[in-house]
């Protein structure tokens, strides 16, 4: 058991109780951590979902493309905790035109949106949280393997490659402050975000058969547990890493 007593964690990206971020928050609370959530757009939905956690946490609004909200984040979080020991980046988005086999025809404006929300926001969130992190802590982002070109994933795959590179540079620059930056690359899960990806059914059908350990597309717990482990002090010398929680598919290829 990994205990995380007396630590405070900011979790972004919770939309439904099927999301990895929700289960990160749930497991972290079960292990003793204090949690603060952020939501965007559908705040009433996020607030309702927060009530399903063991200890319903505060929910703050955060649009990662809004510099005003980012600049005020530390102040708003400080109303609930004076220190952040961990941050979970669970934010990703790409316009429909950037997915589903339209790679060659996607406009730059839509590509820019995917990259800003899904990759650059890791750096933006880290900078926003730094005033409360002091010396030491962990930032963990949610990833999907960007080492190959997946069917239909298109510009979101490019954005995830950017996320992976961004995490390495953050690990370099935040390491002197004792802050670890890692990613968890999960296998496909039947979340609200995944359902919006054209061609997602291809992942659903193939992944369980290809995974040496098997894979349950309805169970976010393996990925969430990996996140909580990285948020804890059990990985004090690990940074700039991508931990694959995908049943082993990344290791065996097609």
Predicted regions and their residues:
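Conserved mid-core segment of classical short-chain dehydrogenase/reductases
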Residues: 60-71, 75-78, 86-112, 131, ...
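Active-site loop of short-chain dehydrogenase/reductase
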Residues: 6-8, 82-85, 130-145, 176-179, ...
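N-terminal Rossmann-like NAD(P) cofactor-binding module of classical short-chain dehydrogenase/reductase
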Residues: 88, 92, 140, 244
């Amino acid at each position: 058991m990994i205990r995380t007593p007396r630590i405070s964690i900011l979790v972004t990206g919770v939309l439904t109780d099927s999301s990895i971020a929700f289960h990160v928050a749930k497991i972290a609370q079960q292990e003793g951590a204090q949690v603060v959530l952020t939501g965007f757009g559908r705040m009433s939905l996020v607030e309702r979902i927060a009530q399903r956690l063991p200890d319903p946490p505060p929910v703050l609004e955060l649009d990662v493309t809004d510099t005003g909200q980012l600049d005020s984040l530390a102040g708003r979080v400080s109303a609930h905790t004076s220190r952040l020991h961990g941050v979970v980046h669970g934010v990703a988005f790409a316009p429909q035109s950037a997915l589903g086999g339209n790679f060659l025809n996607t406009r730059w404006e839509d590509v820019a949106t995917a990259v800003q929300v899904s990759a650059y926001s890791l750096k933006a969130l880290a900078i926003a949280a730094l005033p409360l992190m002091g010396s030491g802590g962990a930032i963990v982002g949610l990833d999907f393997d960007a080492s190959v070109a997946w069917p239909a994933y298109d510009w979101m795959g490019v954005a995830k490659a950017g996320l992976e590179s961004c995490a390495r540079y953050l690990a370099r620059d935040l390491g002197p402050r004792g802050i670890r930056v890692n990613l968890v690359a999960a296998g496909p899960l039947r979340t609200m975000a995944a359902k919006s990806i054209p061609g997602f059914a291809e992942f659903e059908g193939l992944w369980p058969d290809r995974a040496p350990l098997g894979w349950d597309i309805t169970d976010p717990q393996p990925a969430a547990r990996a996140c909580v482990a990285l948020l804890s002090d059990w990985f004090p010398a690990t940074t700039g890493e991508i931990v694959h929680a995908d049943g082993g598919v990344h290791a065996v290829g097609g």
